């Protein structure tokens, strides 16, 4: 979790240099990148003949990440009247999740990385809710933060069903 905290602090510094418009554009493309990785994890889980519920969870998370990207894109277009432009920065959530592909057969590792990724997303949506001037966007960001928390809990549940204990210090107090 210490690495996660450092990563979040670095990301906060990076975000602070962007305008609200740039942060929103960044996050749109980040959700799409995250979706691609969840699709890859679902494929790998199928190859490894892992439980169908885990495969389904990865697929659901991929679809939901795509939906989040689409929702954020609608907010962007409504707010700024144009299509978002890709921001040339690393996509933190996707970068963290991609670590799971380094050793996809190590299921506890994959689940831990995926759970950490969802916590990152939750915290970042909370941050967006704090900095936005748009009340409708604030509501959406808060909603998406809650959804990311449910993703974390779903992954934790999958781990428990498989008899895997994944510890992420401080995660349980992350909700409120």
Can you annotate each of these PLM segments?
Residues 1-176:
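Non-heme di-metal
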């Amino acid at each position: 979790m210490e690495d996660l905290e450092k990563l979040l602090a670095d990301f906060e510094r990076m975000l602070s240099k962007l305008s609200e418009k740039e942060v929103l554009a960044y996050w749109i493309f980040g959700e799409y990148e995250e979706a691609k990785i969840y699709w890859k994890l679902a494929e790998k889980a199928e190859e490894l003949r892992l439980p169908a519920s885990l495969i389904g969870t990865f697929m659901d998370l991929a679809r939901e990440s795509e939906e989040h990207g689409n929702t954020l894109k609608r907010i962007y277009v409504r707010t700024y009247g144009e299509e978002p432009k890709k921001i040339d920065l690393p996509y933190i959530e996707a970068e963290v999740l991609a670590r799971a592909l380094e050793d996809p057969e190590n299921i506890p590792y994959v689940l831990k990385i995926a759970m950490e990724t969802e916590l990152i997303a939750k915290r970042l949506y909370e941050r967006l809710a704090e900095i936005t001037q748009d009340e409708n966007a604030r509501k959406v960001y808060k909603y998406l933060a809650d959804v990311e928390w449910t993703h974390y809990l779903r992954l934790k549940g999958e781990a428990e069903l498989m008899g895997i204990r994944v510890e992420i210090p401080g995660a349980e107090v992350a909700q409120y």
